[in-house]
């Protein structure tokens, strides 16, 4: 049993002195009915009150009106729980409301003259024996009952009188120790919790025992699950309206609303002898309205020392003590996706360290009084100068968000500690937030928007959490900002002021595109070594875009990785190379900072990374970007396709001179190959496959036998390097001729027209996809002069010299990331000296097999440059190479044959890892 005694304070219920009780024989089960708590029958001068929740027992001084289990009911008026706590075993101090609507409120106050000022009908002081338990399940308590209107008949006149109830509180107003559960889609219009009972300290001070403190704590618990809590109303909302419509208690932010009218939860700890501590948990619920917390020092606490200890009346307090105080507390937790829109406002009393003498008294249980909080306005010494921040507060108000919950602040909020955990978020816009400390963990966010302001002694961002200032009018001030373990402070467009910026374990200061001056010290949490391979290595990250700049005015120490976040295809080398992005103004010889590159960024045609040069950090140029590399590789890769087509036609003409007689005919050939290219600037890997079909005939004339024909080629290529990719399509039309003279000298020649279509794609350093396409027209030629030396009728050895060239027109185009490619004309020449050797095996005159071998020296000459963003970049490939090949031709009949060969070419800027063609021909 709790021996709480009713405090001697004036009741807030003005109507308690006007209502009469309507006594009934027993408590009524009103479940399934509509019930009115007020009534009037014109026989009495005041209305009757039927609203007590009570147990039915015969020896009670009060007979109950409502059985304390209400289900599927509609109640109009005010329900009082005052008489539920009777101290009798078996009768719980509990009220359960389910599947019901209460058009009004629940209060723990006395509602009639029979118990005014906390004195029951038997003359004893009302006490709280047991904790009160309130369960609201799938129900609504809307605080809409503002008046009881009743008609009074006076002779021939009927007058309407009003009994005001709007000032009694909001939907749930309790001054007793309570455990409240609101669940299952319930809707409550405001909750007020006050401290109505206390257990007294042993007073007054007697010089021997002192004051024996009562260590009892007045506690309340509130759990709101899967439900809605809104603001209630303390004002008469019926005195104003808009087009005939008055405001509802649940309306938040109304023009005429008082602070109490906008409150969803009010917790008021009074100057009793005991502390009041409340926990409020919102689980998967919505709160719309302010949460107000007020606290004063306990009754026997003296800010400047207890005068009762001056037993000698000489003005000296002996011992010097503040007396007794228990810290009031309100802990609010939002969890599992709960959302709160409103302000958190705290009103407490505090003393500085100079006023802290101790608690308790000598020879009893004296102990020193110590600070329990800090004060934003600071503490001062006797000369009026700032002495510190530590204070002893009468109460503490803490807010925690967990598991994806959200708080959208309104007005001006001031609390002690704010913790934001597990992907939860706090949004401050057109409002302010003052907190002693703010901590974000596990990917949580603090967003400061338009006209939003946040001030704190310490802001701690941890484990990939993020604080961002999204508008120019956003402000953040903190004496110390710590960004830890991959978390990020994004300056955005707002203003950040601090004395000490700590970036540790990969914590990020994101400057973006700002030209920002940080007037603060910058350091790591632990600066021990610059060796990144050691376990105690610590570092922070400074993130910028290429057009951003950070200047630091303060002592700078520690290790920092500089990350370039943006990527673009626009801009020339002059726009980026050696551009300053960080400058440190630190004249302290005892501090040193190391800046290293965190990444490479695609800017224009090249990648860049950060490089420290003394007190500055600049952009250092590196290799080509993937998309620029692909764009510059396209002409060379086009040439590779064309060279394979030249080889395919060359094989057709070579085979016409060996094996069975060839008078011309129709042929078709598959060709393919794989290439690796690297000229020190561009590099790529290429796969090619295609088909050629041709038709030719033999003509005699001019002391030679001529084969003259035409061919069409179709090929697909795939170019790749890192994230770069090009899909190629080509179509070729070619005419060719081969003349074999009587002295076994031959001359092969060809002319061609080719159209190349290339679709380019890549991923930039920031993950952005980029693409583009280009179409190129090209003309080419080929000539091969050789001598067919036949040591016998079956064998041959053919030395030869060849020249070929492809001339591609320039196609100016732009990629999706704004990189411009101009002047892409590309000329390629190939010179070749080699020898072919083979032997023909005849089988019965109409079948023959001719295996052969190739060996050649090849020189490629493609000295070309391309303009990208007005910078000329070498994309030519050249160099000497060796070609080695093997092949065979088999004649099934004198008219039908098949052939195949494979070659390798390596040594120059482009290596052909393999090339092959497989064909068939039908001769006339």
Label each PLM-derived region with a short phrase.
Residues 734, 738, 791, 820-924:
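Outer membrane beta-barrel transmembrane domains
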Residues 31-64, 73-94, 99-133, 144-179, ...:
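Extracellular beta-strand/beta-solenoid scaffold signature
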Residues 156, 251, 256, 634, ...:
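Solvent-exposed, glycine/polar-rich loop segments of beta-barrel outer-membrane systems
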Residues 384, 388, 666-670, 708-712, ...:
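Membrane-embedded beta-strand positions of outer-membrane beta-barrel proteins
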């Amino acid at each position: 049993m709790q021996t709480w005694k009713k405090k001697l304070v004036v009741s807030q219920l003005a109507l308690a002195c006007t209502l009469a009780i309507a006594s009934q024989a027993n408590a009524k089960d009103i479940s399934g009915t509509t019930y009115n708590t007020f009534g009037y029958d014109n026989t009495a001068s005041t209305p009757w009150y039927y609203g007590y929740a009570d147990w039915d027992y015969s020896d009670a001084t009060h007979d109950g009106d409502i059985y304390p289990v209400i289900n599927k009911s509609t109640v109009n008026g005010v329900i009082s729980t005052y008489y539920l706590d009777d101290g009798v075993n078996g009768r719980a101090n509990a009220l359960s409301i389910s599947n019901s609507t209460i058009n009004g409120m629940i209060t723990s106050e006395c509602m009639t003259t029979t118990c005014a000022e906390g004195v029951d009908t038997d003359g004893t002081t009302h006490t709280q024996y047991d904790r009160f338990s309130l369960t609201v399940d799938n129900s609504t308590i809307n605080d809409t009952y503002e008046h009881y209107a009743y008609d009074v008949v006076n002779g021939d006149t009927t007058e309407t009188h009003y009994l005001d109830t709007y000032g009694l509180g909001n939907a749930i107003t309790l001054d007793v120790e309570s455990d409240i559960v609101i669940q299952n889609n319930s809707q409550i219009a405001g909750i007020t919790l006050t401290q109505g009972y206390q257990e007294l300290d042993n007073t007054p001070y007697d010089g021997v025992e002192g004051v024996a403190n009562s260590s009892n704590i007045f506690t309340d618990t509130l759990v709101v699950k899967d439900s809605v809590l809104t603001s209630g109303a303390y004002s008469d909302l019926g005195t104003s309206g808009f087009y005939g419509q008055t405001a509802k208690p649940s309306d938040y932010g109304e023009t005429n609303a008082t602070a109490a009218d906008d409150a969803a939860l009010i917790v008021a700890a009074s100057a009793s002898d005991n502390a009041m501590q409340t926990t409020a948990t919102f689980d998967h619920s919505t709160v719309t309205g302010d949460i107000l917390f007020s606290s004063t020092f306990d009754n026997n606490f003296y800010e400047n020392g207890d005068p009762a200890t001056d037993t000698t009346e000489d003005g000296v307090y002996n011992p010097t003590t503040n007396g007794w105080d228990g810290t009031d507390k309100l802990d609010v937790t939002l969890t599992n996706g709960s959302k709160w829109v409103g302000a958190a406002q705290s009103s407490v009393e505090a003393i500085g360290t100079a006023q802290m003498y101790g608690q308790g008294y000598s020879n009893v249980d004296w102990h020193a009084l110590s600070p329990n909080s800090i004060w934003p306005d600071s503490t001062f010494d006797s000369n009026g100068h700032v002495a510190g921040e530590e204070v002893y507060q009468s109460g503490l108000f803490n807010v925690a968000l967990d598991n994806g919950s959200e708080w959208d602040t309104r007005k001006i909020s001031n609390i002690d500690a704010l913790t934001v955990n597990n992907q939860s978020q706090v949004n401050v816009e057109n409002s302010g937030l003052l907190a002693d400390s703010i901590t974000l963990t596990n990917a949580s966010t603090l967003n400061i928007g338009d006209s939003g302001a946040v001030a704190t002694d310490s802001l701690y961002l941890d484990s990939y959490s993020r604080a961002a200032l999204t508008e120019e009018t956003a402000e953040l001030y903190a004496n110390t900002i710590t960004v830890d373990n991959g978390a990020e402070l994004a300056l955005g467009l707002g203003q950040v002021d601090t004395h000490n910026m700590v970036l540790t374990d990969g914590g990020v200061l994101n400057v973006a595109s700002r030209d920002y001056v940080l007037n603060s010290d910058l350091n790591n949490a632990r600066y021990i070594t610059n060796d990144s391979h050691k376990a105690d290595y610590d570092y922070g990250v400074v993130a910028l875009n290429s057009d951003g700049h950070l200047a630091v005015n303060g002592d700078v120490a520690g290790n920092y990785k500089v990350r370039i976040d943006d990527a673009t295809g626009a801009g020339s080398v002059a726009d980026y190379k050696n551009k300053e992005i960080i400058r440190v103004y630190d004249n302290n010889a005892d501090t040193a900072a190391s800046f290293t590159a965190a990444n490479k960024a695609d800017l224009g045609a090249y990648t860049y990374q950060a490089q420290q040069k003394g007190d500055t950090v600049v952009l250092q140029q590196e290799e080509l970007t993937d998309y620029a590399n692909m764009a510059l590789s396209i002409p060379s890769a086009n040439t590779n396709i064309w060279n394979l087509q030249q080889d395919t036609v060359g094989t057709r003409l070579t085979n016409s001179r060996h094996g069975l007689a060839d008078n011309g005919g129709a042929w078709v050939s598959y060709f393919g190959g794989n290439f690796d290219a690297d000229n020190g600037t561009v590099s790529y890997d290429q796969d090619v496959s295609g088909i050629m079909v041709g038709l030719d005939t033999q003509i005699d004339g001019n002391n030679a036998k001529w084969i003259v024909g035409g061919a069409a080629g179709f090929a697909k290529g795939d170019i790749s390097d890192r994230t770069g990719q090009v899909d190629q399509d080509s179509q070729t039309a070619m005419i060719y001729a081969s003349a074999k003279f009587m002295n076994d000298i031959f001359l092969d020649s060809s002319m061609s027209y080719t159209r190349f279509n290339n679709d380019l794609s890549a991923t930039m350093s920031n993950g952005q996809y980029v693409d583009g396409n280009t179409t190129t027209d090209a003309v080419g030629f080929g000539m091969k002069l050789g001598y067919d030396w036949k040591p016998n009728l079956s064998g041959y050895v053919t030395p030869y010299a060849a020249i070929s060239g492809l001339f591609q027109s320039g196609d100016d185009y732009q990629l999706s990331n704004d990189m411009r490619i101009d002047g892409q004309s590309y000329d390629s020449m190939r010179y070749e000296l080699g020898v072919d050797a083979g032997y023909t095996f005849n089988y019965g005159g109409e079948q023959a097999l001719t295996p052969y071998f190739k060996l050649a020296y090849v020189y490629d000459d493609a000295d070309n440059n391309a303009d990208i963003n007005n910078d000329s970049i070498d994309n030519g490939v050249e160099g000497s190479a060796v070609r080695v090949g093997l092949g065979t031709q088999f004649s099934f009949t004198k008219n039908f044959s098949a052939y195949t060969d494979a070659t390798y070419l390596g040594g120059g800027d482009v290596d052909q890892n393999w090339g092959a063609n497989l064909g068939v021909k039908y001769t006339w």
